[in-house]
């Protein structure tokens, strides 16, 4: 088994650029001797584990989807959070080919595709193969979303070989065929949310059909009626799985969300106290140093985004049992004076009131404002049982039923079924304590997706699909269409099949 696990975890360093001595050594090690069923299970576990880095933290894929949007800003706070301008570049759409965050995510997504594809040469069971192929497709979809072209190797192809590349149209066709092929061999959905499952594959297919027009023409997307019909029928298939909107919105993300949520479709299992999860970074990246848990005082929400919520909307946040009574920390958006569990007002490091101000600039220099600038976000309730150096119990959420319903509503609206779409949206809004909409437009549907799915790594994709990504918003001017795609990192262009995206 040792030879397999050397591959599984050391391969996290793989990139798409081509041949390295490390790659040659890895490939040679796994070729020695037979691989048994336990080894294949280990390889599959490593494929799931490889998803933690790019997806299960605010620093990587989430940063590329959220900090580049109208939802999140990471202001430079005096000498804190400068990072050579990396965070400012994401929000302002001023990144270049050498942006480290973009490079790291591209590499990490490639690691998932390598591990999950390589597993197929070791005689997996039908279900193991289907799960691996789903993870492969999941990561490839992200690469397509971000970069518009997808490097790939055939299963079992040497890690020293130069990857071929599929452009958007071919990749879309490939992903649709691949997901339809593996559907029969995946486990059923609701009982297997922590694994690749049939309903997770259907959600990914929905996202492919819904974004197809945007992936083919990002500047002026079009939406084929047949593609929208596929989105609707897939949503109907998922609806037979017994999902329902969870009574308490934030229970979808709680330490016991595997029990409390009735709408989670695909999650990553986290076991409290065990290594492997980065989920605690979700609250540390945004909370102040003097809060519990102590944070890094970074990520904030823009006031224009926050103001999209009605005061009655439970998604905006408030007190949360097991969190507010333990530390004083509320859930959702944190605005104004912050308190501890005894209702004592907290201070910042300068002795000023720790009262988060909705007004925030991308560069904060006022000593009395820089620590309190910006609304903070706590989407995942804190696991105080597994705090400090331990890892939280909350399962990471990839797909939820609410997203399925909103995608169905969007497809209906784009196909001229506005009344039915409005009914779906109002079902969600009523569940969340918001007033019913009287009409549904693309603009207020985009707003509703923001309200329901904030901090879940969909905002950039949504803004591009709705034609809003290049628009100005707080602390960002109108910008160049080249930013509809990320640049191929400089260190990947040793692959002659990768061509730098236009404008870079």
Would you name each region that the model predicts?
Residues 17-21, 40, 72-73, 79, ...:
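Long, intrinsically disordered, low-complexity segments
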Residues 41-55, 79-147, 162-173, 177-191, ...:
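Conserved, well-structured interaction surfaces
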Residues 87-94, 311-400:
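Flexible, polar/acidic helix-loop-strand segments at domain edges
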Residues 1-28:
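Bacterial Sec-dependent N-terminal signal peptides
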Residues 33-34, 38, 58-76, 153-156, ...:
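Short, surface-exposed recognition loops and adjoining beta-strand edges that mediate ligand/DNA contacts
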Residues 19-68, 487-504:
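Membrane-proximal, proline-rich intrinsically disordered regions
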């Amino acid at each position: 088994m040792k030879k397999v696990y050397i591959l599984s975890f050391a391969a996290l360093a793989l990139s798409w650029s081509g041949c390295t001595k490390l790659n040659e050594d890895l490939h040679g090690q796994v070729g020695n001797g037979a691989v048994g069923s336990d080894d294949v299970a280990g390889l599959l576990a490593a494929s799931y584990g490889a998803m933690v880095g790019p997806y299960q933290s605010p620093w990587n894929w989430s940063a590329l989807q959220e900090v580049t949007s109208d939802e999140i800003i990471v202001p430079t706070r005096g000498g804190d959070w400068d990072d050579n301008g990396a965070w400012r570049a994401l929000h302002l759409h001023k990144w270049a080919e050498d942006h480290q965050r973009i490079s790291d995510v591209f590499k990490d997504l490639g690691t998932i595709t390598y591990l999950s594809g390589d597993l197929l040469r070791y005689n997996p069971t039908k279900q193991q193969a289907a799960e691996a192929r789903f993870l492969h497709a999941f990561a490839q979809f992200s690469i397509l979303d971000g970069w518009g072209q997808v490097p790939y190797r055939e299963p079992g192809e040497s890690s020293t070989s130069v990857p071929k590349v599929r452009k958007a149209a071919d990749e879309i066709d490939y992903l649709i065929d691949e997901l339809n092929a593996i559907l029969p061999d995946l486990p059923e959905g609701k009982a297997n949310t922590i694994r690749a499952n049939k309903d997770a594959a259907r959600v990914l297919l929905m996202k492919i059909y819904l974004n197809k027009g945007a992936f083919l023409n990002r500047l002026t997307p079009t939406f084929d009626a047949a593609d929208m019909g596929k989105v609707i029928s897939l949503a109907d298939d998922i609806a037979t799985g017994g999902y329902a909107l969870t009574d308490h919105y934030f229970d979808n993300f709680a330490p016991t969300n595997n029990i409390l949520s009735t709408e989670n479709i695909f999650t990553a299992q986290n076991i409290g106290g065990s290594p492997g999860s980065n989920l605690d970074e979700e609250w540390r990246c945004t909370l102040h140093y003097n809060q519990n848990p102590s944070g890094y005082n970074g990520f904030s929400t823009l006031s224009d985004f926050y103001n999209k919520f009605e005061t009655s909307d439970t998604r905006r946040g408030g007190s949360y049992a097991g969190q507010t009574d333990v530390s004083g920390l509320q859930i959702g958006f944190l605005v104004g004076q912050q308190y501890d569990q005894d209702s004592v007002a907290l201070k910042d490091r300068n002795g000023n009131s720790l009262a988060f101000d909705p007004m925030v600039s991308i560069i904060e220099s006022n000593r009395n404002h820089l620590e309190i600038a910006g609304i903070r976000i706590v989407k995942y309730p804190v696991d105080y049982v597994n705090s400090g150096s331990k890892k939280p119990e909350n399962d990471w959420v990839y797909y939820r039923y609410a997203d399925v319903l909103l995608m169905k509503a969007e497809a209906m609206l784009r196909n001229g079924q506005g009344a039915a779409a409005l009914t779906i949206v109002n079902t969600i809004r009523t569940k969340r304590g918001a007033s019913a909409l009287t009409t549904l437009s693309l603009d207020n549907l985009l707003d509703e997706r923001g309200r329901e799915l904030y901090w879940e790594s969909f905002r950039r994709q949504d803004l591009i699909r709705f034609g809003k990504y290049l628009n100005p918003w707080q602390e960002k001017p109108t910008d160049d269409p080249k930013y509809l795609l990320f640049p191929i990192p400089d260190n990947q262009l040793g692959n002659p099949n990768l061509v730098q995206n236009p404008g870079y």
